[in-house]
Amino acid sequence: SLTAKLEEMNIGVEEGADAIRIFYKGNVSGANVKTQPYPGFPTDLQPQIVTLLAMAEGDSMVTESVWDNRLRYVSELRRMGADIKVEGNTAIIYGKKNLKGTSVRCPDLRAGAALVIAALSATGQSELYDINYIDRGYDTIEGKFSALGADIRREDAEWEPV
C-alpha cells in the first residue's frame, strides 16, 4: 500500500478514522516499487512516487506492471534535473537531486499532477503546459495547493521551451 511504502521511505504516517497525516521525519530513503492491481501499489500513483524518489536519498527502481508507456513523463522530470533512466517499463532513479524550475509539458493526468509536485519542490520558477490534462481530474488544483501555502497560480501562456 501507499502508506506502507511511505513508512519504508522514512516518511511519517499517522492513520486516523477519517484522515491520514503525512509528515517529514528526516531524510527520505529510496525504495523499490512495483505497481499492481489493488491491494498492491496503485499505478495511478506511480508518477508521484517516481517524483518523490528522484529527491530521496539513494537509488530506487519503479516498475510499471499494469500499463505500457506509463513513463513518458520522465523526460520532463529530467528537464528539471532528475537523474532517471528508463528500461522498458522500469524507471531506475538515482536519487538526491535538487530539481530546478523550468518549462515542462504534462503528457497526461497523473503525470501532470506529479509535475506539479516536482515544480513545487524545485528551486526557481516552473511553468507547466498542457494543463488541460490536470483539469480533467483535479478541480482547481492550484487553489488546493495555495491553501497549503504553495506559491502557485494559473496564467494563460503559450509553450516556450527553455
Residue ranges and their predicted role:
Residues 1-162:
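Short, structured segments at the rim of ligand-binding sites
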